[in-house]
Regions:
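Bacterial N-terminal signal peptides
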Residues: 9-17
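OB-fold and OB-like single-stranded nucleic-acid-recognition modules
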Residues: 21-142
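Bacterial N-terminal signal peptides that target proteins for export
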Residues: 1-8
Length: 142
């Protein structure tokens, strides 16, 4: 009986923590390695395309204070990642698109993003920023 109560409490805690149908994705699961064309997506990442994912990280300093997208990084970045050379560009990032503009959060505030995973080249019309991997955010929690 005690086991059943513990199991039910654990199940309830997990149900409250993750949105229904959201699959956890971590930065170390996004890529499987490199090939002649650059980074290659992992089988897990490609299998989640079009599905709902949840990933945690940090909002990199954006191009403008009010934004329609931002770069989610695995570790806090105090400088603009767009101002670095290609050699300094981290491979543990993902673009997060939002429907309504949001105000940037402090770079060292941990956040969790839940939304639809998209794969494929897309260029932001306003900034010209090109992404290969995005999350269209349904929720951003800090």
């Amino acid at each position: 009986m005690k086991f059943r109560h513990s199991f039910m409490a654990l199940a309830l805690a997990l149900a409250v923590t993750l949105p229904i149908g959201a699959e956890d994705l971590s930065f170390d699961e996004i890529y499987s390695g490199y090939d002649a064309e650059g980074l290659t997506f992992s089988d897990k990442t490609t299998s989640l395309e079009g599905g709902t994912v949840t990933i945690s990280g940090y909002m990199a300093p954006p191009l403008t204070p009010t934004i329609h997208f931002f770069v989610l990084t695995e570790v806090p970045m105090s400088v603009c990642p767009f101002c670095s050379s290609d050699a300094d560009w981290p491979d543990n990032i993902i673009v997060v698109k939002v429907d309504d503009p949001i105000t940037a959060l402090p770079y060292d505030t941990p956040i969790t993003v839940t939304g639809t995973l998209e794969i494929g080249s897309e260029t932001d019309e306003e900034t010209g920023f090109v992404s290969q991997l995005r999350i269209r955010a349904d929720a951003i929690d800090s």
